[in-house]
Curated annotation (Swiss-Prot):
UniProt keyword annotation of Secreted present: yes
Predominant localisation class: secreted
Protein name, entry field: Dermaseptin-J9
Compartment list: Secreted
Family: Belongs to the frog skin active peptide (FSAP) family. Dermaseptin subfamily.
UniProt KW keywords: Amphibian defense peptide, Antibiotic, Antimicrobial, Secreted
A Gene Ontology biological process term: defense response to bacterium
Described function: Has antimicrobial activity.
GO cellular component, one term: extracellular region
Tissue-level expression: Expressed by the skin glands.
Pfam families the UniProt entry points to: DD_K (PF12121)
InterPro entries on file: Dermaseptin_dom
Length: 29
């Protein structure tokens, strides 16, 4: 239902943010 799709979207956003953070760290070193 609503909660499942909401959690899925939050998970996607968190995954993207984590990926971006890792990429930034790699680029900085």
């Amino acid at each position: 239902g609503l909660w499942k799709s909401l959690l899925k979207n939050v998970g996607k956003a968190a995954g993207k943010a984590a990926l971006n953070a890792v990429t930034d760290m790699v680029n900085q070193s």
